[in-house]
Amino acid sequence: MVLATQKGDTGATEQLQLAEGHPRIPQCGVSYAVGVDGIALSLIVMAAILTPICLLAAWNDVSEEGYSREKRYFALMLVLEAFMVGVFAATDVFLFYVFFEAMLIPVYFLIGLFGGPRRQYAAVKFLLFSLAGGLIMLVSVIAVYFAGPGGSDGFLIENLTGNLDASPEALRWMFVGFFIAFAVKAPMWPVHTWLPDAHTEAPTAGSVI
């Protein structure tokens, strides 16, 4: 299905393709709004290709541990893929934040249930670092909303682009909040210390994703 959408002309227009939007919490400006452009579609295709490759690569290892664990593993990987697609397709800043943070849940269980001997320590460390970055990002997300035009669709990226009423200093602090959250996930120095434990203890497919 993802590859079929490539037939659409996603690169010849500034308009998003396959766009869909529904108000969810209009009092707070939150909408379910998704759509793709050329970049988003490329990332979605990459996620759609990598996930089955990771599942096939881990098939024998997980199958040896029993059918119930196999079901949990494949379910977690598919949930993670769904959240990744949501991150790439979201056109509402708050919805993007929800998908971005929701990815922590399947990754935490992938490490904690299917990792190496120190998997619990690695999973908790990854979770704490990511939650700390996510909370800082949430502050920036809320600040962006109040600096924007507001309204029932105040979190839509198209409404926020070029319409933030804030001082240069405030905008810099908003950027810092997003940067810290992305730096944790990247990961970048000095917030990278969760990486050696997580990638060492995580199952191979989890590390790839």
Where are these regions (language model features)?
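Short, hydrophobic/aromatic alpha-helical segments in well-folded domains
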Residues: 81-82, 123, 159, 179, ...
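Internal transmembrane alpha-helices of multipass membrane proteins
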Residues: 18-31, 36-135, 199, 203-204
